[in-house]
Amino acid sequence: MWLAMPLIIASTLLVMKLTAFGTMKENIAKQFEIFGNKHTWAMTLLYIVTFGSFIGFSMALPLAITVIFGISHVSDAAGVIQHTLKNPNAPSALTYAWIGPFVGALIRPLGGWIADKVGGSIVTQVISAVMVFASAAVGYVMLLAYRSATPEQYFLVFMGLFVLLFAASGIGNGSTFRTIGVIFDRTQAGPVLGWTSAIAAYGAFIAPVVIGAQIKAATPELAMYGFAVFYALCLVLNWWFYLRKGAYVKNP
């Protein structure tokens, strides 16, 4: 399953290159130049942090609410926690799941505005740090809730942290969009935006699958800890490429 996506992407690009002819071939060749630019790959990862997280968590949040908080996690006679008893005080995913994506979408223009004022990469750096903290904290709250007979007691903290994740990803979506426009010239900015958006959109598949798999393994917190590690690595990547002394473009 995990090999299918890169294989499909690679096959699609190969078919585009081999079947192009005439003027189309020249245009394709120019667009493919972005793959030889290291900043394309750096910005792809950073856009996964922002847009990929936004769309991925939009899909995964209802699942997490339903499974983690919709069940009372009670120990049996042998002391093994069972995840089968319905929680009568469970919060409704339909009531709450829309709040995070709404906040993330609403706040995105603010991210672009702030990035125009202080620079895109510094904004991306700040929101990446916030996402490291929030993702790790959500993981810990998941751990507590998934071992509790009354998981609803942790729900408000869980939702607050997830809304923070959505807000940070929304702001970062605006800042990374701005950074791409500064780093690349007009002929490459469009293809890079298309490429990064397409790859980041796979977050809608990856986040629910990862969180769902970890819930099935009774360790939902590991999914969020893993995301926190990824965000931390991308925070270092952003600093190395765009904020350190001698960067190719400082704070684009």
Annotate each language-model stretch with its function.
Residues 1-5, 212-231:
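A membrane-interface helix-boundary motif in multi-pass transporters
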Residues 48, 95-102, 129, 194-202:
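Transmembrane alpha-helical cores of Major Facilitator Superfamily
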Residues 121-175:
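C-terminal transmembrane helical hairpin of 12-TM major facilitator-type secondary transporters
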Residues 183-219:
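A late C-terminal transmembrane helix in Major Facilitator Superfamily
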